[in-house]
């Protein structure tokens, strides 16, 4: 993540974000783009399983398309709504776990159940999405979906959407950084069962994380 450059393109920085996820946590999973989705994490290495995590990346300088703590309704969120609805209703994917918006520094992590509750469970919204997806509305472009369908709906529910937020630039202590990495572990993002004490990090995993982020254990 030290390779993130604010003045570089979204594509440039996205590659570093996906590489970080592969190297740090997901060597046993496929982490790649998927169609128009910036980043997708699959349960399997060969991608034979459905997508379980969807990631939307923006450049740090692209503030207009990235959320803030005061307002989730931006293009990145509108894109996540579209990708979620496609996975749920076009691809019949019922195994989604989390959706993420990040610029490399800031991370908004949202449980897929929040999207299920606020979007997929709304029959009127689902019908509007399906009509648009089947070219039965006056507008058919993805831009129109963002502005005419997703944006008004997000405005209705944004105050009720629960999310985790971290700005890694504010993480000064090694212990705080390790809490961030724990959020990105498969145990959390893929909701995998943990049999060990959740308050303890596996020693090998802990040491590997320190190596990846260029730290040494301080006692």
Report the location of each language-model feature.
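Charged, often low-complexity linker/regulatory segments
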Residues: 1-29, 196-197, 201-219
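Phosphate/oxyanion-binding active-site loops and adjacent basic polyanion-contact surfaces
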Residues: 6-14, 69-79
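Short, glycine-/polar-rich solvent-exposed loops and beta-turns at beta-strand/coil boundaries
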Residues: 32-35
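Charged, often flexible domain-edge or linker segments that flank or initiate folded functional domains
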Residues: 37-72, 79-219
């Amino acid at each position: 993540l030290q390779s993130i450059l604010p003045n570089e393109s979204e594509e440039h920085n996205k590659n570093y974000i996906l590489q970080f996820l592969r190297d740090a946590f997901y060597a046993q999973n496929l982490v790649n783009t998927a169609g128009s989705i910036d980043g997708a994490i699959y349960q399997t290495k060969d991608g034979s399983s459905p997508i379980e995590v969807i990631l939307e990346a923006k450049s740090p300088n692209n503030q207009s398309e990235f959320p803030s703590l005061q307002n989730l309704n931006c293009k990145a969120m509108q894109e996540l709504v579209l990708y979620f609805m496609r996975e749920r209703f076009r691809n019949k994917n019922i195994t989604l776990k989390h959706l993420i918006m990040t610029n490399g520094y800031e991370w908004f992590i949202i449980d897929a159940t929040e999207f299920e509750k606020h979007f997929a469970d709304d029959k009127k919204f689902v019908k509007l999405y399906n009509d648009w997806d089947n070219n039965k509305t006056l507008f058919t472009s993805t831009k129109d979906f963002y502005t005419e369908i997703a944006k008004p709906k997000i405005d209705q529910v944004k105050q009720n959407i629960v999310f985790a937020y971290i700005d890694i630039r504010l993480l000064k202590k090694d212990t705080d950084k390790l809490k961030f990495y724990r959020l990105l572990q498969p145990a959390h993002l893929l909701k995998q069962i943990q049999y060990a004490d959740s308050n303890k990090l596996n020693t090998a995993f802990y040491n590997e994380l320190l190596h990846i982020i260029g730290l040494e254990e301080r006692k």
